[in-house]
From Swiss-Prot:
A Pfam family this chain is assigned to: DUF2115
Species for this entry: Methanothermobacter thermautotrophicus (strain ATCC 29096 / DSM 1053 / JCM 10044 / NBRC 100330 / Delta H) (Methanobacterium thermoautotrophicum)
Family statement drawn from the similarity comment of this UniProt entry: Belongs to the UPF0305 family.
The name this protein goes by in its record: UPF0305 protein MTH_811
Listed NCBIfam families: PRK01022.2-5
Superkingdom of origin: Archaea
Length: 155
């Protein structure tokens, strides 16, 4: 079994064990993580992240059969697991981050996620760009180092 197949199988097995309590736990985690986000963006972020979490779990429970993006990953799976442990991420957050990054090849902020200054995450020519990736490099709670998005070019 290839490493990518093993990862998908492990994520599917994890998703099968998740329930309502896990969703409540992730909601609390997200609200706590976003406590310093400007108020007008906070609800948007929490709702977007909750949607990603639910979609990821449902995809995995339904037997998502996409092509893993692990070969193109810029951040090792081992390092990603270490970072998730450092921030005490609930299991469901880890599942979502690993699924979106290493299986679906998607950024951790969905395209269209707004940021102060009128900027947002964009996808151009198959590449995801984030306007705040470099600015979050010193934030110990941010997972930007795991995310596949690149820093948006300066306007």
């Amino acid at each position: 079994m290839k490493g990518s197949d093993a990862l998908i199988m492990a994520l599917r097995n994890m998703a099968a064990t998740l329930g309502v309590y896990d969703l409540m736990e992730v909601r609390v985690f997200l609200e706590r993580s976003c406590r310093f986000v400007q108020e007008r963006y906070r609800a948007i972020y929490v709702d977007a992240y909750m949607s990603m979490v639910v979609d990821s779990v449902l995809d995995l429970k339904a037997g998502f059969s996409g092509t893993p993006e692990m070969d193109d990953a810029r951040y090792s799976l081992r390092d990603a697991l270490k970072r998730l442990d450092e921030i005490n991420a609930p299991t469901i957050v880890g599942l979502t981050v690993l699924y979106r990054t290493y299986v679906k090849g998607e950024p951790l902020h969905p395209p269209g996620t707004p940021f102060p200054g009128g900027f947002e995450v964009e996808k151009k020519d198959g590449v995801h760009y984030c306007p705040v990736k470099d600015k979050q490099s010193d934030n110990p709670e941010a997972l930007c180092d795991i995310c596949i998005a690149r820093q948006s070019p300066l306007p």
